Amino acid sequence: MFRVSCIQLRSNNNIHNNLDKTSKLIIKAIKQKTDFIITPEVSSHFSLNKKELLKICTSMQNDIYLNGIKKLAKKYKKWILIGSLIIKISKNKLVNRSVLIDRSGKIRTYYDKIHMYDVVLSKKEKYFESKS
C-alpha cells in the first residue's frame, strides 16, 4: 500500500518556527510509515503585508524553509510536495510556488500559482492575492 500524508499547520510570519513545526509533523508522518508527504499552501510563512514579505522572502537557493525540507527528504528518503511557499524572484516581485522534492533532496519541479484570487471574509479579514 502507498501511503500519503497531508501535513496541516497554521503558518505565521516566523519562518524558523514554521520549519520547526513542519519538520516535527513530517517526522511524525514518517514514523507512521508514510511514502509521500504534502504540506499546505504558504507553509513557510504567512503575512498579509507585502512589504514584510519582501523583507523576509528570498530566492529558492537561499530559502531556509525549502532547504530544511530538502534535508528532511534526503535524510528520510521521502518525496515531499511543498504545497507552496513565497519566493522572491526580483526586488519587488513574489511568487506563490509549489515545489516537488525527491527522496534524494533534489527539486524535481516547481509551479508558480497563476490563478490569484481576492476575497473579503469580513471587515477585518481580507485577502488580495492579485496585489502580490
What role is predicted for each listed range?
Residues M1-N13, N18, I38, R97, ...:
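Active-site-proximal beta-strand elements of phosphoester/diester hydrolases
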Residues K55-N67, K126-Y127:
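A short acidic, glycine-rich active-site loop
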Residues N62-K88:
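A short, hydrophobic beta-strand-centered structural micro-motif
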Residues I89-S132:
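Active-site catalytic loop in hydrolytic enzyme cores
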